[in-house]
Amino acid sequence: MNAQAILVLDFGSQYSQLIARRIREIGVYTKVIPYYTPLKEIKNMNISGIILSGSPASVYSKEAPTLDMEIFNLKIPVLGICYGMQIIVKLFGGLVSKDSKQEYGRSEIFLKDEKSLLFSELPNKFQIIMSHGDSIEKIPDNFKQLAFTKNCIASISNETQKIYGLQFHPEVTHSEFGDQILKNFVFKICQAQINWSLEGNLETIVKKIKLKVGSKKVILGLSGGTDSLVCALLIKKAINENLICVFVNTGLLRKNENKKILELKHQYDLNIKYIDASTKFLNRLKNISDPEEKRKIIGKEFVDVFEKITLEDQNIEYLAQGTIYSDVIESKSKDSSSSKIKSHHNVGGLPDKMSLKLLEPLNEFFKDEIIQIGINLGIKKESLYRHPFPGPGLAIRIIGEVTQEKINILQEADNILTEELFINDLYYQIRQAFVVLLPVKSVGVMGDQRTYEYTAVIRCVNTQDFMTAEWTELPYSFLKKVSSRIINEVRGINRVCYDISSKPPSTIEWE
């Protein structure tokens, strides 16, 4: 896309793409590139503003990512967020302290300069999300303080050069007025024009798929989740019958998943090939407890299945995946300055060498954008708003070794949770809900008998984009009913817990 863009220089923050998402939400094209992109390339880009992302690094580290000072001479407005502000301070001769108080989570900010365009139309105090270990000790010459918290300098600016810094994260949904701050930077400071729409970008993606694939065929692993279904219909729109959807029964699926996925064949006129590989997957996972190893094994087994299919049809050249932005972000490795959270099956679980070329048409979109694309493609509510299900399936919701017994137990427990969510009209009010089976047994009493069985954990979260999430405050009466049903109806579980962890610091899935 050649439209003028807001450029996000990524220093390795898990939220870099989220910054881009927030700005795209207000209608402006946004591009994310690595911080080490040569200045010559940046000069050749059509950009109206630059945002410096956060980073897990400290500016004091010898290997800390840095920036070419010449970028500030391009006469383009710059906004540094968290680490981005700290690198500005360091480069301009200020002082960043690594011994000051760390701040993580909610904090109250107070405006010192209410006339700044960055905080235009905002109250003089509000709640924001902090996530930093270092903080500003001394502001550089020609900069001024715009805002503060009880513990640190929260914002600075050099109005003459249009350089701004925020110690907090306006891009996360729990920062009050974060969207307005980004709007102020984009429209009032950068003078950017509205030039982005999901519909227009959708047409571009279809054209790109046609151009890339040509007359070749594409296979796609259909999981029944929103991402893979949207991906399938998008590719079908581009290449029609040259898309072959493959439903691999891994034996790690939700209860009755086979039936639901095969129904998609008739609902959306998809060419679906069914393969039962459950025995093979379970045998390969025997005695494996490490979550990363489980993901890698499952990824390799999927590719093996797909590559065998290509032997039957030499015209198949591409493997399509419903990889989305958050998958890519969480799978970034440390060599790109981002702390790796976990490898996603879609991006980190595939072997380095495979004969198929990878096609990922959704890897620049966030979850809410995927849903909007699905609406545009005519996907029904019950398919579009199904709760996400990971590629490795129940293998990463069974903590520790995967066995057939544990799969059966978890399928039944998870199905009870889903049933009760529908019965109580709660399913569509929650973005993701599932049960985790722990490798922990505890003593219980059922009737007059002593039991020693597994512990199940219910996990329910609400989120807009799956980059941050809050645990869902469900009614006690509902939790009591679900717990009672699981313990009484599922042989093998005698204790049920409820996970009240938010993201961050926890991830949504346990593995």
From Swiss-Prot:
Pathway: Purine metabolism; GMP biosynthesis; GMP from XMP (L-Gln route): step 1/1. Residues 5-195 form the Glutamine amidotransferase type-1 domain. GO terms for cellular component: cytosol. GO terms for molecular function: ATP binding; GMP synthase activity. InterPro entries: Class_I_gatase-like, GATASE, GMP_synth_C, GMP_synth_GATase, GMP_synthase, GMPS_ATP_PPase_dom, NAD/GMP_synthase, Rossmann-like_a/b/a_fold. The active site is at C82 (nucleophile), H169, E171. It catalyses: XMP + L-glutamine + ATP + H2O = GMP + L-glutamate + AMP + diphosphate + 2 H(+). Keywords: ATP-binding, Glutamine amidotransferase, GMP biosynthesis, Ligase, Nucleotide-binding, Plasmid, Purine biosynthesis. Disulfide bonds: none annotated. It is an enzyme of class 6 (ligase). Residues 196-386 form the GMPS ATP-PPase domain. Its EC number is 6.3.5.2. ATP binds at S223, G224, G225, T226, D227, S228, L229. Catalyzes the synthesis of GMP from XMP. Homodimer. PANTHER family: GMP SYNTHASE [GLUTAMINE-HYDROLYZING], GMP SYNTHASE-RELATED. This is GMP synthase [glutamine-hydrolyzing]. It comes from Borreliella burgdorferi (strain N40) (Borrelia burgdorferi). The lineage of its organism: Bacteria, Pseudomonadati, Spirochaetota, Spirochaetia, Spirochaetales.
